[in-house]
Amino acid sequence: MTRLGSQGKEFPMMNLNETAARHGFCVDRVRESEELHGKMVEMHHEKTGAQLVWVDNGEVNKTFCVAFKTLPEDSTGVFHILEHSVLCGSAKYPVREPFVELMKSSMATFLNAMTFPDKTIYPVSSRNEQDFLNLAEVYLDAVFAPRILQDPNIFYQEGWHIELD
């Protein structure tokens, strides 16, 4: 089965239904979304409880985002500091600023990280499939195996400030 994308190109549709499972993710719900112009599949990971939403709408711009609930207990800005610290290298990519390297070498159409009052997100987009997969791999390694775990100085360098009287 194929679907015509927004650019008139045909895209194969993944055959997922509510009994399907892939890579430890089980499908909870499949529905058509008028707002997103396609099929939306909601899934959860059996071991970790991670939630995943996949949208099949034939869009040529592929987008991936890792998001975490980060509910602050105070106004220190610790989650914003962590957002920056996470992007200071990882186990597979131990360079000082992989985010900067990606901006120079990737074909990304969007590359960022953002902290909101209740969540922190790490979104990437690319029209090139291999570039998209590379971006997703770098971001996943950054959030699940950040260098900050071995080097706490990363947190200190990202979290300092000067107050002038």
Which positions does each model-derived feature cover?
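N- or domain-start disorder-to-order transition segments that initiate the globular core
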Residues: M14-E59
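Acidic/histidine-enriched alpha-helical segments
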Residues: A145-D165
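Short, Lys/Arg-enriched N-terminal segments with co-localized hydrophobic residues
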Residues: R3-P12
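M16/MPP (pitrilysin/insulinase) zinc-metallopeptidase core fold and M16-derived inactive scaffolds
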Residues: G38, D56-L135, D141, N153
